[in-house]
């Protein structure tokens, strides 16, 4: 909600969307808070405590992250929107939504527990969703009884990154204690390098964010498109959609379309917000809130997209190239057949679809697909959503990621 207050803003620094991923209870939210505390000590941002990040009553009651939370901070070189993702397997759909908006990720791994199930699945999902750069932060270093474990853990993490297609030999892997760094900054909010080793380790992580994550190439000249991540009701203001602009740019007063689920809706941009600040224009990569004319809870929902008029349509039938993960990759153990109905993840939406026919690139049609196979498939979703050719998606079933695909053709269903 902080993104929806008032202040004129024009960002002059390079903007990146980064986030924390990793297994449940390994310290992602604490690390997010520690980063803001250290940067606040330098004078670049406002500090955020854990309970201000996991801010919903449900999260406070359960003492765990459930939703993706957005935190703003700046370094000397860059402006960041930080997406703190849930690590529990039950909320993997929210994690996918967060990662789909990131330019790079910080993988948090407990030094005590080492890499766990969601550590590996989050690395896999980051790769499938197009993340090319991951930094690793081995947290809870202070809780280790034997410091000689660290070199072995670091080497293990490098091998895991390589297995999933990341440059593990060169990926930065840093160690520290987010909790002790946060406690030190709460006790003395002024940052002084060399005064506290745990604070210095967070400072080093921040430096690596600036140095290691490449500047993203934004699609500024493409038609405007923003997937809706959340819809928030602001009292005396109305419904505000939040999300990250995928491509193009948008100005206050411009006409847009709301596409997905039902008939396309026409609207106009009333207000643009980025965290605490009002924008006149927002561009690709910006993490914003947008207030549109004439919206209600029926025509303005998570999973829809806001787009330049006449540039995207809703579809529920398409042909896709699909790879089904092997068991060793975390995928299925057994084949599936025509009529299989898993969950498909596109941008910010999770939707059930039916796989109606299968065909090998060489070898013709088949009625059964084995783990490890690459096929073409016709898929019908249970309702239409905004789709385009060459869009990537993730397939999940029963709590496991089982495949990845790319849309080849969009199909109109004949009446």
Curated annotation (Swiss-Prot):
PROSITE patterns: G_TR_2. The keyword Metal-binding applies. Residues 22-29 are annotated as: G1. GTP binds at residues 22-29, 84-88, 139-142. Pfam families: GTP_EFTU, GTP_EFTU_D2, GTP_EFTU_D3. Mg(2+) binds at residue 29. Residues 63-67 are annotated as: G2. GTP hydrolase that promotes the GTP-dependent binding of aminoacyl-tRNA to the A-site of ribosomes during protein biosynthesis. This is Elongation factor Tu, chloroplastic. It comes from Coleochaete orbicularis. The lineage of its organism: Eukaryota, Viridiplantae, Streptophyta, Coleochaetophyceae, Coleochaetales. The gene is tufA.
